[in-house]
């Protein structure tokens, strides 16, 4: 292991930040405008958007690898990513609410227990850690219904499931579902999201939760490699993707997670504008945008401005827009996402 050293870099003025970027090869059309952007967005945040276009070796000067990149191009890419994050974040809310509702309803109804989530026998692992997470999330909440419960009741100390699980984070909710023992209730919830295997839904919720957190904390998502790779199933209750399509997808990139989100939305929110809005966003005239950076299959990249539909089912005879889930013979149809 390399020995650690002292951090000796000094802060830069805004003018010095512009000069640094110019020295490295970034083109500025209006330095005063660029200075204003840097004062609002920050040099360090924009670094995530310049990094892919710079030499970044250990002893590198971080020179731009292309001589035609303007500061405006970096801002355009940043703004595209910001709009993308906003769209994704607002969309995930629907999935998050649906997951909360189904878990609470199914387990509360089947157990007849308002506080079923406290029952250790329901879990296969991680009970103590999960209870600590739920307790922390509930105690952190400022919701009036939590305050009302705490002011009126002293036993149980935790509010009922429909209150407590309403305020826990999506990450905690995902962890709860993963920790629950495999039984018919868990399988039933999985089927409500169009999936046949519980492990797939567990993976999807984990992946979507991670993406949600990136959006919530204003982290870039456009070219991110996610820590959790998405499992893309060959066999689902409704049309998804065929084996050939799945084999072309990088499962740790954004495209894979968006495909899962789109599939779930077609089930829980038919007629959602998500696919339409993604299609419009991908028409961006951002010069640095390359769909391959988002994990799109490479042959789609040249058509960034010509996306016809987010999801379609293609056969030899016809193309059918998929606005609601339908069961089709998978032998005669091929399901693709973001195709042209």
Each language-model region and where it sits:
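Long, contiguous internal "core" modules enriched in hydrophobic/ aromatic residues
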Residues: 2-316
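Acidic, Ala/Val/Gly-enriched low-complexity intrinsically disordered segments
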Residues: 316, 320, 324-329, 335
């Amino acid at each position: 292991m390399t020995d650690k050293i002292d951090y000796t870099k000094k802060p830069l003025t805004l003018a010095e930040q512009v000069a640094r970027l110019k020295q490295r090869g970034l083109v500025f059309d209006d330095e005063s405008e660029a200075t204003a952007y840097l004062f609002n967005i920050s040099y360090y945040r924009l670094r995530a958007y310049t990094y892919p276009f710079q030499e970044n070796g250990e002893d590198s000067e971080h020179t731009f690898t292309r001589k035609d990149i303007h500061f405006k191009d970096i801002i355009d890419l940043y703004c595209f990513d910001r709009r993308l994050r906003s769209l994704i974040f607002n969309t995930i809310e629907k999935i998050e609410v649906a997951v909360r509702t189904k878990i609470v309803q199914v387990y509360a109804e089947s157990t007849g227990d308002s506080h079923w989530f406290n029952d250790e026998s329901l879990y296969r692992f991680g009970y103590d850690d999960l209870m600590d997470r739920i307790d922390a999330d509930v105690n952190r909440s400022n919701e009036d219904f939590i305050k009302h419960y705490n002011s009126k009741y002293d036993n149980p100390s935790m509010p009922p499931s429909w209150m407590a699980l309403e305020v826990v984070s999506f990450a905690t909710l995902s962890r709860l579902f993963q920790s629950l023992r495999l039984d018919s209730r868990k399988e039933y919830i999985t089927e409500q999201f169009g999936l046949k295997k519980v492990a797939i839904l567990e993976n999807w919720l984990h992946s979507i939760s991670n993406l949600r957190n990136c959006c919530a904390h204003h982290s870039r998502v456009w070219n991110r490699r996610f820590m959790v790779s998405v499992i893309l199933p060959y066999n689902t209750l409704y049309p998804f993707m065929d084996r050939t399509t799945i084999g072309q997808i990088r499962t740790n990139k954004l495209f894979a997670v968006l495909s899962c989100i789109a599939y779930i939305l077609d089930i829980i929110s038919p007629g959602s504008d998500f696919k339409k809005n993604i299609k419009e966003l991908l028409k961006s005239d951002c010069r640095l945008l390359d769909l391959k950076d988002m994990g799109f299959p490479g042959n789609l990249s040249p058509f960034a401005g010509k996306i016809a539909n987010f999801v379609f089912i293609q056969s030899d005879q016809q193309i059918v827009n998929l606005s609601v889930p339908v069961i089709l013979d998978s032998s005669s149809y091929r399901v693709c996402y973001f195709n042209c």
